[in-house]
Amino acid sequence: MSEPLPSSFEEHPQFQEETSLQKFRRRLKEEPLIPLGCAATSYALYRAYRSMKAGDSVEMNKMFRARIYAQFFTLIAVVAGGMYYGSERKQRREFEQMVEARKSQEKRDAWLRELEIRDKEDRGWRERHAAIEAAANEAANAKKSFPEQDAARSAIEPSEQKSIGVLIAVKELLSRQ
């Protein structure tokens, strides 16, 4: 099953785990030093830019060195966080795979239930229409079984016949005269 199963449950909120904003917040709480290092790098670059505009080359060189230190700090935070949270991330990945498998099974089960309901409705519709057709055939057979009675009725009670049209009514009047 490489393709997802079609269903009306596709966009159901029950089948969504975590949004990108929730994931960003979770990662920010897990490793707060990485965004801190990125902010320090950005601030050092900003100060170096201002020093360059002011023409202060000594301050600009200090800020470029500070940028390098901030980037080193960020890199160390990434590596240390990866080592510290490595086993937890592996467990989380396994958990997310299990959750994904469970959710895909739930979607598949919901899709199958939906198909079963549609199949029951379809069978019910076919049975109703088969019963209606059988009743119509039975009524037609019952009507054909007494043709003499129909002929006698039409001869006795012409006023009860449905009018077929104006032209036929005029022809009937002319034929009586």
UniProtKB/Swiss-Prot annotation:
Associates with the respiratory chain complex III/complex IV supercomplex. InterPro entries: Hypoxia_induced_domain, RCF1. The lineage of its organism: Eukaryota, Fungi, Dikarya, Ascomycota, Pezizomycotina. Residues 139-158 are annotated as: Disordered. The chain crosses the membrane at residues 33-49, 68-87. It comes from Aspergillus niger (strain ATCC MYA-4892 / CBS 513.88 / FGSC A1513). Pfam families: HIG_1_N. Disulfide bonds: none annotated. Keywords: Coiled coil, Membrane, Mitochondrion, Transmembrane, Transmembrane helix. This is Respiratory supercomplex factor 1, mitochondrial. Gene3D superfamilies: 6.10.140.1320. Belongs to the RCF1 family.
